[in-house]
């Protein structure tokens, strides 16, 4: 009798322990973030103007400000964890941080293994021209027979070279081709819309944004699947930050335009 009773108690104990472990494992990420008091944010820290360190060693940038605003809406503080891009998705899946704020494109492939916030930036390839240039290039096709500056080895170089007839000039980076464009040695240049907005905002060169070319690329904040409460909290925070103008203010601070709205 005593042995049978002991077995029942042991079984009950094991069931209880298993249930407690399963419950703890199933705890929504929102509960963990609230209990901890911080939202752990993965980013590179070497990707201006989105995230990089200032001379004082503090992380600054568009994504840094966005992450801080989202964390504040959740009632916690942002805690940043820097990591190389090559390992950032793996770091998220391993639980090294709760979310990533590093211009992660929302793609069908990534959505198979991750959940995403609503998009908070929209980018595409974009032309840039001199301010005094009255020509209106609406597509890469319009640049046939013209000189187009791009950075060597980029997808923008490949995009430009895919259109026959464009005189593609390659450069080590944006500063070099922007100087040549301003000097009249190029008809236009091609780069990422967000990067060009940042460069033109912070440059004294007489340049202006041109037409968007190619499809729009939305970016969002990814996190691990299986956290419905956290997903709703993130979604609600993003909606509020868009509605109260916070996203627009942050965007204007870094780019001089609103990159948080879909490209028209």
Task: Label every model-predicted segment.
Residues 26-103:
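Extracytoplasmic small-molecule ligand-binding "clamshell" domains
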Residues 37-43, 139-153:
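Short loop->beta-strand "edge-of-pocket" segments that line small-molecule binding or catalytic clefts
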Residues 64, 80-90, 135, 154, ...:
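Short helix-initiation/N-cap motifs at beta->coil->alpha
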Residues 65-73, 147, 152-154, 218-257:
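Extended ligand-binding regions for polar small-molecule ligands
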Residues 87, 104-112, 159-162, 180, ...:
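A ligand-binding cleft/hinge motif common to bilobed small-molecule-binding domains
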Residues 122-129, 193, 197-239, 257-264:
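Periplasmic-binding protein-like
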Residues 155-168, 207-210, 238-264:
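Ligand-binding clefts/hinges and TM-proximal coupling segments of bilobed small-molecule sensing domains
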């Amino acid at each position: 009798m005593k042995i049978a009773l002991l077995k029942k108690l042991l079984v009950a104990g094991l069931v209880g322990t298993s249930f407690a472990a399963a419950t703890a494992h199933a705890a929504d990420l929102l509960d963990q973030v609230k209990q901890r008091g911080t939202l752990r944010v993965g980013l590179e820290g070497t990707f201006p103007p989105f995230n990089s360190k200032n001379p004082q060693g503090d992380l600054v940038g568009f994504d840094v400000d966005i992450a801080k605003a989202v964390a504040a809406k959740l009632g916690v503080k942002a805690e940043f964890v820097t990591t190389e891009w090559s390992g950032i998705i793996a770091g998220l899946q391993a639980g090294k941080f709760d979310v990533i704020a590093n211009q992660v494109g929302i793609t069908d492939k990534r959505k198979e293994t991750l959940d995403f916030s609503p998009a908070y930036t929209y980018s595409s390839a974009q032309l840039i021209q001199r301010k005094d240039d009255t020509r209106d290039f609406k597509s890469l096709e319009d640049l046939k027979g013209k000189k187009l500056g791009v950075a060597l080895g980029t997808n923008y170089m490949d995009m430009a070279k895919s259109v026959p007839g464009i005189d593609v000039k390659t450069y080590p980076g944006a500063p070099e081709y922007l100087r040549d464009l301003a000097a009249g040695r190029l008809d236009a240049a091609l780069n990422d819309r967000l990067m060009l907005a940042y460069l033109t905002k912070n440059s004294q060169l007489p340049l202006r944004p041109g037409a968007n070319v190619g499809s729009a690329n939305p970016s969002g904040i990814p996190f691990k699947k299986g956290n419905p409460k956290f997903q709703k909290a993130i979604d609600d925070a993003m909606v509020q930050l868009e509605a109260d103008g916070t996203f627009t203010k942050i965007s204007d601070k870094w780019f001089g335009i609103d990159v948080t709205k879909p490209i028209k």
